[in-house]
Amino acid sequence: MTSASQILVWGLLAASGAQAQNYGGGSSRSDDAFSYVQPKNTTILGAYGHSPAVYPSPNTTGSGGWETALAQAQDFVAQLTLEEKANMVTGQPGPCVGNIIAIPRLNFSGLCLQDGPLAIRVTDMASVFSAGVTAAASWDRKILYERGYAMGQEFKAKGAHVALGPVAGPLGRSAYSGRNWEGFAADPYLTGVAMEETIQGYQDAGVQACPKHFIGNEQETMRNPTFNDSAPLGTVIQEAVSSNIDDRTMHELYLWPFANAVHAKAASIMCSYQRINGSYGCENSKTLNGLLKGELGFQGYVMSDWGATHSGVAGIKSGQDMDMPGGLGAYGQTFINRSFFGGNVTAAVNNGTLEESRIDDMILRIMTPYFWLGQDQDYPTVDPSTADYNTFSPRNTWYQDFNLTGERSRDVRGNHAALIRKQAAEATVLLKNKNNALPLKAPKTLAVFGNDASDITNGPYNDATYEYGTLAAGGGSGTGRFTYLVSPLTAINARAQKDNTSLVQFWLNNTQIATSDVQADLLRVPTPPTACLVFVKTWAEEGADREHLRLDYNGTEVVEAVAAACNNTIVVTHSSGINELPFANHPNVTAILAAHFPGQESGNSIVDVLYGDVNPSGRLPYTIARNGSDYNAPPTTAVTTSGREDWQSWFDEKLEIDYRYFDAHNIPVLYEFGFGLSYTTFNISDIYATRVVDSITSAPEDRAIQPGGNPELWETIYNVTVSVTNTGDVEGATVPQLYVTFPDSTPEGTPPKQLRGFDKVSLQPGESTKVIFELMRRDLSYWDTVSQQWLIPEGDFTIRVGFSSRNLKEVTTITPVSE
């Protein structure tokens, strides 16, 4: 048993380790960085600038299939002392990134919480998978599930009970957000599907999923408050940025994918650093009690992001259930040896400030998914190597003995290398392929350019950008520790040997390439190589928003210098997401591939695509504009005033993000949302829609809330069928996409079209197949702010199906509710 006074000690130690990781946000920016200064006279919050109070925090009922596990959790809670209850909701320093200590007398071994969304970050002998944005670019439900399941297997085998992912916040409001790559797509529907498939994969493997960051977490700059460190507790100078989001936008954009997460029975959800409509994410009763636990019927527990707890009693009453990592404070503040939770929970119950029943519900929410997933039955112990790599809470900060007696450095990778290679290849997006430059056909000579082509030079773990070495993951808590990383140059050399390619030249110094006459100074041969491969990259990380949308390390200049000398220049980008591509129409740039962050099999996966072993079938999960200045919804990077509440981010674009914005304003783009080429061709035909229910009303029947909300919203009401044919000469996969245009009766501000269905189909030459899209009630509904419910508008819906958001071949109409 740990006393209240003991609980107060370790908060300092855990939090100090967190501060050292420098994930705080609001870091300094270079002189030429993109800047958006908040306009003056916006510091007085508007109609949606104040988050309304919603109390009390709803109790869990175990609905959705957790009833038996809830009964087990109730029996467990009934045996706890008050001090043990405080420990159950408060993190401590230990071997994992987050730790809930064991209670041996109840045979509870504690909880190990581990980063992150593409790998187990603090361990060895584990795989590094492709990033979320890469997985989303596959537009493949099977890949999304398999990736989640394989990661879940590795987390479990290392003894982690909770995987801190996947990510739906940021959604991708801004092209500049530093963490877009951790998430999936700049669209709520595609992100929602990716969340659901990934969570089901994690949890089918026996690991709790923790979707994050709830909600409106769309920028890194000023995500935490600034403090006067000289004050006893660190007086706040300026509060964290507030994401100010209107009710309809909240529901139709930012809450949408979290509804999928809850529908998938996610065990936990992480609340975010920043404020939402004036209140911090982890003490916002409207978002936690009202939206998440109330409207969506979430049955699991809400944990704080690391250092995102700003209060004890207020946060608990507002719906927060677990404090991580357990110490008092937030990033940038001098931590002291107390916890907002911990001993303060005990004190608050004893003095009547908190009802013990609320603490009981917090623990029921924590333990119900634990029992539901069978984590009380022969669960693997924590790998001791985890502690060796965990700089978040080094061993000398631990207050408890974690009895790490299991096998050290256990290899949990299994056969996942082949899976990672396949997934990354199939997610690669072919943006340009002039004159069928790809696939390569045993070229006689090759030249490889760019610092992204080579082996990494800074070791297996990189939390900051690096000049030399291929980029396979971003930085921050969402990164991974490579046991190996196959570079493009290594894989190309291996393939060249196999093909008897006579010469593979390479230049890795971007400055040298960009400032040279490539033909005269570098190639020094009378005729250019058969193909020139240029590898360029763009870093992004937690804690800082992107400063520009250009390629890093003079990448554009490198491409242009090579293209000036080589009439078959093939460009591969390893990027966190959106890039400006001013060379896209250069006549000598014959092919462009967006490979995003592919994980440890980077080189092998791109060579599979370059040589045609895999026909690329990735599609863009965002829009690539003609110019960086064409994007809307910038992050707030600075303010001109010094008031405590002055950091505001006004989501006044409302529903118009990414393709919705470009479509609404008829802005030409370079490559549209959903775009991607193949080495073969496809056709779509014969669209028809079928109503599958007899009667459809505008409002859903008022039914008991289940995980995901009103179950009526998840019922299919229409099927839309099309025929897809491979009209080319080689096998390939394509992604038919369905977009809905709402009737004119829908309120103003509705986007011209919205993604509401997709499927990936693989076909042999000449083969055809039927694709059926199931449209649920929620897919045809908008959020009505007056009645506070989802409504299907009266009138005709236009249904379009095609191969991208701007290549829609087949059209039909449906009328669910007549005028």
Curated annotation (Swiss-Prot):
Catalyses which reaction(s): Hydrolysis of terminal, non-reducing beta-D-glucosyl residues with release of beta-D-glucose
Catalytic-site annotation from UniProt: 305
Subcellular location: Secreted
Gene Ontology BP annotations: cellulose catabolic process; glucan catabolic process
SUPFAM superfamilies: (Trans)glycosidases (SSF51445), Beta-D-glucan exohydrolase, C-terminal domain (SSF52279)
Top-level division of the source organism's lineage: Eukaryota
InterPro entries: Cellulose_deg_GH3 (IPR050288), Fn3-like (IPR026891), Glyco_hydro_3_C (IPR002772), Glyco_hydro_3_C_sf (IPR036881), Glyco_hydro_3_N (IPR001764), Glyco_hydro_3_N_sf (IPR036962), Glycoside_hydrolase_SF (IPR017853), Ig-like_fold (IPR013783)
GO MF, one example: beta-glucosidase activity
Cited function: Beta-glucosidases are one of a number of cellulolytic enzymes involved in the degradation of cellulosic biomass. Catalyzes the last step releasing glucose from the inhibitory cellobiose.
Protein name: Probable beta-glucosidase G
Originating species: Emericella nidulans (strain FGSC A4 / ATCC 38163 / CBS 112.46 / NRRL 194 / M139) (Aspergillus nidulans)
Lineage: Eukaryota, Fungi, Dikarya, Ascomycota, Pezizomycotina
